[in-house]
Amino acid sequence: MTQRPARNKAQVIIIGGGASGLAAACVLARAQVPFLLLEKEHKLGRKLLATGNGRCNLMNLGPPVYFGDNRFASRVLAACGAAEVGEFFTGLGLAFFEEELGRVYPNTRQAATVLDCLTAGFINSPGAQVITGVQVTGLRQMGAGFEVMTASGERHQAPRIILAAGGPAAPKLGGSALMAQELTRLGHPLQPFFPALCALTTETRPIRGLNGLRVPAYVTLLHDGLPVSTAAGELLFANYGVSGLCAMQLARDAETGLAAGKKVEISLDFAPLLGLAPALMRRLEPAELAGGGHQAAALDLLTDRLNTLGRERLYTGLLPWAMAEKLQNLPIREAAQWLTGLRLDVTGTQGLDNAQVAAGGIDCRDISPLTLESKRAPGLYICGEILNVDGDTGGYNLLFAWATGILAGRAAGRG
């Protein structure tokens, strides 16, 4: 992949070969604007290949769900939303489909297909130059443009820069906060990074013996006993606590609560596992779930099964074996309470090393939502996860990455 560029011919330097950087490269190539793409990993799109468990949840067609500078995110998506991103990928030849909850995936269900389409969108363009395995260490304004410094001592100049270097989540896949720190030298405020989509560490005694078990559940996060947020989906028990998408969605609120010195707990409701109609028909509010909203229905269900099947077969065919064994000797009222309102103290998260996405980042007040251009350093365009925007699980973070990359590519191409 590495191509050595001829010096001083690039009109734009893209720092970062992740989702937003690759999108920007495609836009510049289409506009026939000469550019240089610098990526510190030896392959482009490493983090992209891991998204959606390798399936690549391309975007989400539902209402936007963003945190941090969420108003900025709304303005970005008003300028380049899911429809425009869909047209962008259609133009690259990618076929995709919508799954439940507005989630969009490539037809092949393989992230590699998305990366192939993106790479093909620029790699053979006459003005495209790519260098992989190069660590950018510095960025400075000079004259009418910028100079980029690298760990190997090479320096590259261009009138415009697209900074798409990502955030510190998942460093094994290339995550780093280095360029975010570099931007503070140019006057951009940085909101502290912390895990936004990450497994939770909890007390483990109440869930001992359930390690590796996956079940559908509602999970409610509480601060000092008050419900803050809830999520539904697959829950995975682990030897350190809980994972699965519905737990990971709550990491942001868990981190903020713990940082504020609050008692943080989760309440687990396994009503979907029990097949209770209310759980399947509507999503309860956090206050209902935290209060054991399905406890009465669970008690009725267990009472009927006890009368019909007896104690030995009470949970057979209803619960996974490991969970049934845990409840077998409990009075059914306690079992119903456990199944619809199990409380666990949250002690932390698995950290940025294991997070899918980082919250925090470069404050967006000094960045144009229409062009992603810095107001402090004109000619510098900042896009993707390095910004103080993070989205819910389900394709929202990639949608924001594509949109910001496309807008930055358009604006930098026009100059």
What are the functions of these language-model segments?
Residues A169-E182, L186, N388-G415:
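A conserved FAD-binding loop/helix module that cradles the flavin
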Residues T132-G145:
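A conserved short coil-to-beta-strand element within the FAD-binding core of flavoproteins
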Residues E41-R71:
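Conserved N-terminal glycine-rich FAD pyrophosphate-binding loop of Rossmann-like flavoproteins
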Residues R4-S20:
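Beta1/beta-strand and adjacent pyrophosphate-binding region of the FAD-binding site
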Residues A73-G81, L101-A120, A170-G175, E203-R205, ...:
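Short beta-strand to alpha-helix junction loop
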Residues I13-I15, L38, V136, R155-G175, ...:
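Short hydrophobic core segments
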Residues R30-A31, L58, A78, E84-E87, ...:
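Residue-level recognition of phosphate/Mg2+-coordinating polar/acidic sites
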Residues I13-I15, A29-N53:
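Glycine-rich FAD pyrophosphate-binding loop
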